[in-house]
Amino acid sequence: MEKHGTNEGALWGGRFSGGPSEAMFALSVSTHFDWVLAPYDVLASKAHAKVLHSAGLLSDADLDTMLEGLDQLGRDVADGSFGPLPSDEDVHGAMERGLIDRVGPEVGGRLRAGRSRNDQVATLFRMWVRDAIRGIAVGVTELIDALTTQAAAHPDAIMPGKTHFQAAQPVLLAHQLQAHAQPLLRDLERIRDLDKRLAVSPYGSGALAGSSLQLNPEAIAAELGFDSAADNSIDATSSRDFASEAAFVLAQIAVDMSRLAEEIIAWCTPEFGYIVLADAWSTGSSIMPQKKNPDVAELTRGKTGRLIGNLAGLLATLKAQPLAYNRDLQEDKEPIVDSVAQLNLLLPAMTGLVSTLTFNTDRMRELAPAGYTLATDLAEWMVREGVPFREAHEASGACVRIAEGRGVDLVDLTDEELAGVDPRLTPAVRDVLTIEGAVASRATRGGTAGDRVSEQRDRINQANADHLAWATTPVRS
């Protein structure tokens, strides 16, 4: 088996007489996905250099040289002039090589004291995820804003509400749109709650047992924007439940968008005819000239399966690892980086799609009473007249059966037909057999009455603004 050169430049080569085989190195190398951590490596290395200095392990001059070298390395990473070589095993080795190239081995070689790749990567990955979820949160707030803006533009439009995908009761279009905003708000709450657990720094935990060099994990944690340092060095280096939790939150965002996407796909069909897609957010067919396809919504629905798969795969990776660190954990980053990348594609696309929808409110209004959606209003009118609901439910169902037999709506039943079902069904019941009356009567908190929906929208917008303010506040000063 061919060898991959020597271990010169590797972070672990002293114990070995030769380098890894080509196949071993190909399996081991991770710079193609962990290079996203390079900017965070610079930040953490600067903080680590300062605690080495505070512990008397770096002179003033060496600290200045090291910080200048790290700053230059950070600039070179940012502008692309420094990157990993084919011989670099991972981001950590590449970045140490870059520092030594800039400050020399005498100073650059001192930085590794008191830290392991185990605590280093756990810290850098947390830093990356904290920034990434804030970017996702901004995208979610923009989608919520698109939903509430459309809701505010159609305050009185009535549509069929459905359960089991069957006609149920009339609701306001604004109520339906805001129903999609609510789970997205909860997703933002999940992001912020996740961040509380992400804000614990593993730095200073070493390989698993901590450090004997009397370094200061709390100082590093504070400089890197963490709320605290980890309480248990074994757990800090070996746990990735923060990653699986992030994978869940990201997948849940996709699932919530997929439900919205599913409705958009249905609504733009001729059978529904509720909406027209903007040309900029739809595609055509290579053979059927008439087609206008909801590709944004379909890709959202399809990519959601990908994010669910990322979550399932990561959980499977974590399920049977003994303490402490195991190389299996190298597999933690790709699923999360991919899920973030997919949401960064989907969120602006779905926001653009929603914000440019044209609603056929006349069509929605026409279909709102179809399927006898006012049957519950008839039954509840009887309840208000003192009839037990069991009897009212039976009477309303009987009215539906008669109307179905005649092929008419409930409001088209004659006074005699209503009274024949139950003498307590007087002509006054007709006051509630309108979709406007049905909507207006649902005036309790959370209901579909116009005033309640407007209040809901105000609360959504207020919460959304608070989440946006959090998401746009930098983790590190």
Curated annotation (Swiss-Prot):
It comes from the Bacteria. InterPro entries: Arg_succ_lyase_C, Argininosuccinate_lyase, Fumarase/histidase_N, Fumarate_lyase_CS, Fumarate_lyase_fam, Fumarate_lyase_N, L-Aspartase-like. Transmembrane segments: none annotated. GO terms for cellular component: cytosol. It is found in: Cytoplasm. CDD domains: Argininosuccinate_lyase. Coiled coil: none annotated. Its EC number is 4.3.2.1. Its main location: cytoplasm. PROSITE patterns: FUMARATE_LYASES. Pathway: Amino-acid biosynthesis; L-arginine biosynthesis; L-arginine from L-ornithine and carbamoyl phosphate: step 3/3. One of its GO terms (biological process) is L-arginine biosynthetic process. Keywords: Amino-acid biosynthesis, Arginine biosynthesis, Cytoplasm, Lyase. GO terms for molecular function: argininosuccinate lyase activity. It is an enzyme of class 4 (lyase). NCBIfam families: argH. Belongs to the lyase 1 family. Argininosuccinate lyase subfamily. This is Argininosuccinate lyase. It comes from Corynebacterium efficiens (strain DSM 44549 / YS-314 / AJ 12310 / JCM 11189 / NBRC 100395). The gene is argH.
